[in-house]
Amino acid sequence: MGYFKRVVLYIIVMVVSVFIIGCNKSSDTSEKPKEDSKETQIKKSFAKTLDMYPIKNLEDLYDKEGYRDGEFKKGDKGMWTIYTDFAKSNKQGGLSNEGMVLYLDRNTRTAKGHYFVKTFYNKGKFPDRKNYKVEMKNNKIILLDKVEDINLKKRIENFKFFGQYANLKELKNYSNGDVSINENVPSYDAKFKMSNKDENVKQLRSRYNIPTDKAPVLKMHIDGDLKGSSVGYKKLEIDFSKGEKSDLSVIDSLNFQPAKVDEDDE
C-alpha cells in the first residue's frame, strides 16, 4: 500500500512539473520581444547621438560619454569628431564643398581641426583642396592660419555645425523610409522625405544659398554594427538636389572614437 502511494505521488509530481514547464515556455514565448524593423533600428542607432542635438556649446561634449568597446585603451576617455559641409555643383561641371571638421579630445579637453574648401572638376583637372587650421576655446572657433579673403575669414570664424542648431529628437516621426542594406560591409542606408516646413530645413535655407524650393530628402548612412561600434561611421545628409546631375546637400556627422592610438597603429 505504501509503495502504491509513492507511485501515485510520483506521478502527480511529474504531471505538475510538466504543467509548470509548459506554462513557463508559453510565457517565455509570449514575452519574447518582437525584433524592430531595420528602419526602426537605424533610427535608434542615430538617436544615440542625434538626441544630443542641438549642442549649442560644443564644449559640453567633453563631458559626454559615447559608445565604448574593446578598441578603447585603458584610461582613454575618447574623442568626439563633429563634421558639417555644404556641397553643390559648380559651373565647371564638378562639385564644390566647404565646411569644417573638429576633433574634441576628452582626455586633454582640447579641440582642433580645420576648415576646408574643395573644388572637384568634371575631368581633365586635379581637384583643388585648401585646409585652414582652427581650434576651439570657450565655444569659439579661432582661425590659426592667415586668410587674405575677408569673406572667407568671416565664414570660418562664424561657422556653426549643423549639430549646434539642428533638432532631430522627433526622428522617429519620419516614416515610410526607403531602406537598403549591404550585409557584407555591413552598411545601412535609409531615406525619408522631408517637408519645407521642417525647422531644420528652414535653418539650412537661412544659412546656405539653396536656390530651389524642392523639399529635401533626409539620408542616413551607417557603416558598422547598428548597436554601436567605435570603428563604425554614421553620416547624415539633407539632400536638396534637383536631379542625378545636380548636387546640393548638407552633410553632417558626429562620431565617438578612441583618442589614444598606439605608435604601431599610426
From Swiss-Prot:
Major localisation: membrane
Pfam families the UniProt entry points to: DUF576 (PF04507)
Lipid attachment points (N-palmitoyl cysteine): 23
Cleavable signal peptide: 1-22
Keywords assigned: Cell membrane, Lipoprotein, Membrane, Palmitate, Signal
InterPro entries, alphabetized: Csa (IPR007595), Csa_sf (IPR038641)
Highest taxon in the source lineage: Bacteria
Gene Ontology cellular component annotations, sorted alphabetically: plasma membrane
Subcellular location: Cell membrane
Lipid-attached positions, S-diacylglycerol cysteine: 23
Amino-acid biosynthesis in keyword set: no
Membrane topology, from the record: Lipid-anchor
NCBIfam families: SA_tandem_lipo
Similarity field: Belongs to the staphylococcal tandem lipoprotein family.
Official protein name in the record: Uncharacterized lipoprotein SA0403
Organism annotation: Staphylococcus aureus (strain N315)
This protein's encoding gene: lpl7
